Structure formats: C-alpha cells, structure tokens
Amino acid sequence: MLAEARAKAGKRKLKLEAVLESLFVPVFRAQASHKSGGSFTRLIGRVVFDRNAELQKFMVGELAQVIIQFSRAFDEALPGLDNTEMDWRSHFMAGAMAHTLCNADLLASFTGTDVGAEGYETTVQRLVDFTAAGFRAKVSTPPKKQKSS
C-alpha cells in the first residue's frame, strides 16, 4: 500500500494520512479476515508486549525492510520533525495500534460500543486521525528540573 500511496502522490509530498493508512490497513484487514482472530491478536500482543529479547530481535530482523520503508515515508511526510521526536511519536503510534488491535473488546465492555459492527475501516480511520494529530502536535520543551532545597 505504501508504494501505491507514493505513486498517487507523484511529485507532491507524501501525505501523513496516506502513510498511516498504508501501515494500519493491512494489519487491521488481516485481523478482520483471519478465521482465528484470537490467534492473530495474541501474536501481535506477544510481539509488542513480550519482553523477550530474542523474539523482538527476530521480528525486527523479519520486518527490517518494512521498518526502513516506513521510516523514510514518515520522514518525507514530516520533514520538520527531528529524529528524537519521530522516534517517540512512532513509539506512541505503535502502542496505540497494538492496544487497539489487542483490546478493542475493552471498549465494548466499558461503554457498550460494538466496535465490530462498524468494520475495521472505521477503526482504522479513527486511528489515522488520532495518530496524525499526535505526529503533528507542537514539539514541547521539557520542563526544567528544579533544584531541591
């Protein structure tokens, strides 16, 4: 999907929302179409939340080319964001995606909202809107540490 987004952009700057959709849609589509959605969700949860260094190293190795392609796309879509901010915002984006994939049922149990009734496309659009706002948020300077008396 990222190649399609690049082709559609042509000579124009790649849009952040197009990059986010290219990242989210295949993952949420796979979850929605997987006959055993629970297994897929557990795999995502384990990869993201498991503190197993070997598993994380394996997944980074498997996904290295995808990570590089999306890193370049985010850099292109957000040229003014420095590496540290990009890393943090990407970290928050990945957390929001993983939480949504693994815990959408919590929303239903707390609020009665049937997230499955809307289809994955609506969930993806909400996640795109939310994470795009986070990526575009003003860069804050950390508060200065006060000397203790």
Where on the chain are the PLM-derived regions?
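Hydrophobic alpha-helical connector segments
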Residues: M1-F40, S90
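Short amphipathic alpha-helical interaction patches enriched in hydrophobic/aromatic residues
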Residues: L2-A9, N52-L55, F74, L78
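Short linear capping/connector segments at secondary-structure termini
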Residues: A3-K8, I44-R46, S109-D114
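Short coil/turn segments at secondary-structure junctions
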Residues: A7, K11, E54, F58, ...
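Amphipathic alpha-helical surface "interface" segments used
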Residues: K11, R46-V48, K147-S149
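Amphipathic alpha-helical segments used for helix-helix packing
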Residues: A18, K35-A64, A104-S109
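C-terminal peripheral helix-coil segments that are non-catalytic and often amphipathic
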Residues: A18, P26-R29, A64-S149
